[in-house]
Amino acid sequence: EVPAGTTVLEAARIAKVNIPTLCYLKDINATANCRLCVVDCGGRALQAACVLPVTPNMVVKTNTPAVREARKLNLELILSNHEKKCLSCVRSQNCELQKLCLDLGVESGDRFAGAQNEYEPDMSSASIVRNNNKCILCRRCVGACANVQKVGVIGPVRRGFKTAIESPWGMKLAEMACINCGQCITACPVGALTETDGTKAVWKALGDSAKHVVVQPAP
């Protein structure tokens, strides 16, 4: 038994039944965008478990051939507009999208090959790098910014194929009211939002014999 209002996804997690997700973050983001959590409830169409409330005597099938195929199809559609440079991505081997591809047997993202959006990475911020070429439009960063930090400076813009997660009027990160908290980075399941990498600057400083370098570890 679960409390009234519990979703099928949360009930499944309580019961230790695995249902894959990409866009869901408990109490932060439940928008059913990725459609990877679809389940069979006996109706004409598969339902998104993350927004589907549990009802009495409900029968839910989470791992039928039709469910697995639908999840795989939706994952391939997500990959069709995703930059596939996994070897050079800082999230390689720590990427939720990559892990789901392995779990669902998706070997390439070429099934729906076609036009792709191309964006210039935003490196204007002192602490955050935004690369929308890797964005999967899950909106987890939007939920974290609005619901955790209560700042709400990013959101979906435009429609259809041109939809992107950006700041208002196309402003760069350094130009808007971003407080550089990093909650969006923590929420991002892929490499679309990452921390600014200061590795090269550190190596350069260490190699400068005229510079006295002090290291301070963080707790």
What are these regions (language model features)?
Residues 8-42:
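A basic, amphipathic helix-loop patch mediating RNA/tRNA/ribosome contacts
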Residues 35-180, 186, 193-216:
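Fe-S ferredoxin-like electron-transfer domains
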Residues 1-6:
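Short, contiguous acidic and Ser/Thr-rich linear segments
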